[in-house]
Amino acid sequence: MCYNVGKNLNEVYVNMSTGNGVFDPIKLDGSWDIQILEPPELICNSLEEIAGSVTLTDNWLKINVPGSWETQGISPYFEGIGVYKKYFDITDQYYSLLKEGNIYLRFYGVSAWAEVILNGVNIGHHEGIWSPFEFNITDLIKKEENELIVKVIKPGKKFLPLRESLAGFLPDVCMPFGGIWKPVEIVIKKDISIEDIRIKSDIHKNELNLSLYINRDNDEKSLIEIILYDGEDVLLKKAEEIYLNSGTSNVQFKLKIDNPHLWSIDDPYLYRLEIKVYSGSELSDRLVKKVGLREVRYSGSNILINDSPVYIRGILHWGWYPDTVAPIPTEEVIREEISKLKEAGFNLIKHCLYVPIEEYFDIADEMGMLIWEELPLWVPKIDDKIKEKVYKQYNEIVKSIRHHCSIIIWTLGCELDETADYQFLNNLYNMVKGLTDGLIRDNSGSGECYGGLLNENADFYDYHFYTDPPFYKDLLDSFAAQWRKEKPWLFGEFCDSDTIRDIKRLIEVYGELPWWIFPKGFGINWNISYHRQIEKIESNNLSDKLPYLVKSSIDKSLVYRKLVLELARQYKNISGYVITGMRDTPIATSGIFNDFGELKYEPYLIRTINSDTAVTIQWDNRRRWINGGDRLIRWDRFNYQSGSIIRPHIVISHFGKDHIKNARILWTLEDGKDIIDEGEEYIECNLSPGMVNEIATLEINTPEVSDITKLTFRVKIYDTDLEEVIAENFWAFWLYPKISINKYKEFSVCLIDHCNIFQDVKDSIFSKFNLTSDISNCEVIITTTLNQELIGCIGEGKRVLYIQQGGGYIPVERKPFWRESIQIMEKHPIIRGFDNEKFCSQQWYSLATDTVFTSEGLDRLAGNNGKWYPILRRLDARNFDLDEYLVEVVLGKGLIIASTLRFQGGLGDEANGISLNPAGEYLLFQILKSLLKIS
């Protein structure tokens, strides 16, 4: 809140123009002095008292402005007061201009609380990281040796608690940053000045509506001149003399534009708007903005830009830049980020719980990248004090950036719970709605999911789903149900997928582990151990495998994201998504960019699903009469017995510019580089932009195979009118050899299934063997329970498969299979054919489990005389714990193969039974062959 000299000390908001003005500003950037001071131990009632409690010394250090102090030799954990000092002179020419107006000291951003003292006079303070502020210093400025002192307190634990400020999420990503992190300058304002502007397009009336907020010192007429440039040419010019009252006046203008060139993602055309105000015949102030003419609204579930449906394909940006800590990337970095994102098919960046620098918005306007601005309210301590801060700081923030045409969505906080009451959020929503356009929502993530409000203030639905692929369908069927009121439905963040950090390369770049990778203790205490990654992978003898782990985790991450995005694109009422996240951070490696700013995936691979028009596949529904009624049956869609027919339904999600009338489907089935089948179909699509429809069902005959075989199915959609491919995609399927009916009947297998996981015994692999219930008279035991009696049998020579999918004889932990981990396959005959990919892909879809054995539990099982050997392992991508899915345990004369894998499927939309899970059935077959010693 800004205190101004010459006014009573009430909080006054001034949203200054960021245009050119009449006079060039004096830049105060560069070298400053700083002292780092710890306040004495005393009870303070206010930040002003804390700032006043320190005593300056002669011990000044050098620091650069703008920038955070954490990157300039000051401990990231320092929470005292940073006292900045700068001496500056005013040039003769500039000083002579002072009589023509008022002089202001302008700060574009200080984190987070600043008290400003000029020439020994305390001129006020301001709280708020993200918004600019200024002070009138006309009566204090001197021609020579002005002394400027700024006392700064950053958010933390001591004086400005994180949850009582609007620090956003960066303190939880790494830590709160402190200092004068944006430029500082001195500007002159004459007697009339443009304080604020709101720009709104009406594309149906071909109008550009301007709302100007003009301040003047007295009541008088003023000439206002508006010029709109199309390139270098003057498109229109309008001048009007208007009577302005003393103080701030709101002046409205409508500019009629013939055949306007609209701004869009593919054609981000910008006009240049120049506004001049005169005092008599003299120019008093000047404002220049680049403006894009566009309209954002929604119809049903579709988001429309200039009346055209747009499918949101966003990336979540937390503002993490390790070299600067504060989110102040260079222009080069911003352009590179946006260019790479567009190349990968993204059309939106969600700036999550922070406000990027002005240059980011400028470049997004220029390059056609949509922006979702999420304002920085995160797990707040809600009381009247924080509410007052939110109202005032949001007013400042929104007014400072609302003119950018790239901003189309606003959210006012993230995952707020029941402490954020209806009246507060309703007031906030209405305030922001009155300040800007676009789609607005009070709570990203939805109060429905976090115990918050159900009567939300929202122009769209917004959910944050983080889960394994088998659970997405049930979530979507419930949360995106057709009975809900029709409006856009977005994933405000979702689909994170951690990869293994290339920690050795990170050390090579920094010379050591970077400071930011160590736990901080400021925000949330995450269960992460990146600082111990080398220690833990070395202790598990995985150090030599690090390059393999990094690559395999990236490959698996792409599979995961492709699975999830393809499913999301098949729902007509889902309007888009934001993927978590932009780049790897101190708390997660789920970025699509790694620590070095490199895209983890080939762009064309992401574009297969992340484009305006996407082709996906869906499958037949199946039912079965069970216990007197029909029940839905789920079967594995990625694995088939050789010779099966595969029936993919071709589904198009079309958000391109053109109506698709006629198309050709071109498909191939490939074994490695060899095409073993292909075909094409002509279809009448009749797809308008914004539609999601099935366009065809294909039947593909698969070959007979003698070993596990991976096939690749590729589809291209060719628009016969446009004569171009508008979408293409690919999928992997696996074929398994047929198992002879009579070949294994001589082998007796005892099945002990107290957990009832093999309900379809007669239709499955078990029918190939001589099934018995006699433990003593069998060659192999398959059991879902383990006890001392069986342990004794094993010691005497029995060979056992023990399947434990929950609590049981061996201690287990519950952990996701797909997220936050990578699977490691050791050389073993029972997974031959399952280990060709070197990572767990869709082949493992209905084998995936949420249960792992701990090494400590397996050590206890093996005891002093036994030994266990890993076959399939889980390495956690965040804390690097190593757990087990499939192991071989030697006990005495016998052997146990123990597994937590789900041979019968059953989690989420995995297969409902072993007979519907070819991969599970064949893996079980290979385990049985190994236990029976059959080659």
What is each model feature region?
Residues 1-72, 151, 155-158, 231, ...:
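Accessory carbohydrate-binding/adhesion or oligomerization-edge regions at the termini
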Residues 18-19, 26, 30-39, 74-75, ...:
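Accessory beta-strand-rich segments of carbohydrate-active enzymes
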Residues 66-90, 97-107, 111-118, 124-127, ...:
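Active-site-adjacent substrate/metal-binding segments within catalytic domains
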Residues 118, 207-242, 251, 273, ...:
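Beta-strand-rich binding/interaction modules
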Residues 142-145, 213-297, 705-739:
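Extended acidic/polar, glycine-enriched regions
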Residues 338-339, 348-597, 781:
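Substrate-binding/catalytic cleft of secreted carbohydrate-active enzymes
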Residues 776-816, 893:
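Short alpha-beta junction capping motif
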Residues 808-812, 818-926:
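Catalytic beta-strand/loop cores that center a nucleophilic Ser/Cys/Thr
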